[in-house]
Amino acid sequence: MSERFSPEQQQLLALAAVFEAAQLADDVAQRGDCDSQAFEALIAGVMELDADNFDGVYSQPGLLREGVSLLSRSLSKDSRGANLRPLNYGLALLHLAGKLRNNEDTVSILRNRLLALSGQQAHFDRFSDDAFCHRIAGIYLDTLGTFRFRIQVKGEPAHLQDDNKAARIRALFLAGVRAAFLWHQLGGRRWHLLFQRKRLISVIESIDINGLR
């Protein structure tokens, strides 16, 4: 169990990690880059296969502030003028994670591929290395990329056609699905976003966002 956060806060922060991945993917698609520390934290979470609580997957929740902010805006009644792209990506990642949960064969393949990559981590300096991102992106394409449901990414053509940037976006989408799995594991459900908005906003307000480390 996490000693820093209540069960509801853990659940909320796991959901925020989904939207953090969505925001970073949009950043890469639009301007070709994203927050490197937040990127590293999300990809590190992908490699934590057996953790059963938030702290076990994300040791630096302070790097998820953008995700918390994006989630907060999406739950508010007045979201006029908000950038809808990352919101749509986040919801799509939740849907994609649901598709994955219902496909045990693909879950098994995904886990085995990640376990194999985990055994080779020493060959990479950082999770943000282009070579590592391509490995993660390849796993995404060979598993989630085989589903009929696809996430349509909008961005600058020069960035979307760049192999390294495209790999980062796919790696972030896999990170978002991993976060969505944790959210579901902690009791999160998509219908909560429709029918428990006030409760979710209350949980967000109970977290000292600026004090997160």
Curated annotation (Swiss-Prot):
The listed locations are: Cytoplasm; Cell inner membrane
InterPro entries associated with the record: HflD, HflD-like_sf
The source's domain of life comes to Bacteria
GO CC annotation, single: cytoplasm
Q: What is this protein called?
A: High frequency lysogenization protein HflD homolog
Q: Which NCBIfam families match?
A: PRK00218.1-2
Gene from which this protein is expressed: hflD
The record describes its membrane topology as: Peripheral membrane protein
> What Pfam families does the record point to?
DUF489
Source organism of this protein record: Alcanivorax borkumensis (strain ATCC 700651 / DSM 11573 / NCIMB 13689 / SK2)
* Predominant subcellular localization, coarse grouping: cytoplasm
Give UniProt keywords alphabetically: Cell inner membrane, Cell membrane, Cytoplasm, Membrane
Q: Which family does it belong to?
A: Belongs to the HflD family.
